A protein has these predicted regions:
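N-terminal beta1-alpha1 ligand-phosphate binding loop
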Residues: 1-18, 23-28
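Flexible, gly/pro- and Lys/Arg-enriched active-site loops
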Residues: 24, 31-39, 54-144
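Active-site-adjacent structural patch at catalytic or cofactor/ligand-binding sites
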Residues: 42
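Helix N-cap motif at beta-to-alpha junctions
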Residues: 49-52
């Protein structure tokens, strides 16, 4: 939906704010949820921040809104989808932002880019089970 590279760039800029950051490569994966739509472009952003999970969720929603995201169809097409996966060693049981993300270990589009930035968090066996589902596209700069 729209310029995926531009949406990812906008999302990164808004979510990271002024915090130092690292970013994974961008990967293309099949859509999740069973609704017919284009393949997804995915990345993982790591930021050094004192923001709480709720603060990060607010940044995520701001980024999605800036890219014109609407929530008309559950798991339907969207311009940008930002999930808060981990916040240091913090946990959150707030139903709006569960941390660690409860399904991240089931998602190739999370684990492959996460492994680039934090290899100690992802086991090799788990990675191997997902590799054929993910196509590396390159860095975000290459896709703009």
């Amino acid at each position: 939906m729209g310029d995926r590279g531009s949406h990812l760039s906008t999302g990164v800029e808004i979510v990271r704010g002024n915090d130092p950051f690292r970013i994974s490569q961008v990967y293309e994966t099949d859509p999740v949820g069973g609704v017919a739509q284009d393949d997804f472009w995915n990345l993982v952003l790591e930021i050094q921040t004192d923001a709480s999970p709720l603060d990060l969720l607010a940044r995520a929603r701001e980024a999605e809104a800036a890219c014109g995201r609407t929530r008309e169809v559950h798991w339907g097409p969207r311009t940008l989808d930002v999930d808060v996966l981990l916040v240091g060693d913090e946990t959150s049981e707030n139903p709006d932002v569960l941390v660690p993300h409860p399904r991240m270990h089931e998602r190739a589009f999370v684990l492959i880019p996460l492994q680039e930035l934090a290899p100690h968090l992802v086991t090799q066996d788990l990675l191997n089970s997902f590799r054929e589902r993910v196509v590396p596209l390159g860095t975000l700069d290459m896709l703009r």
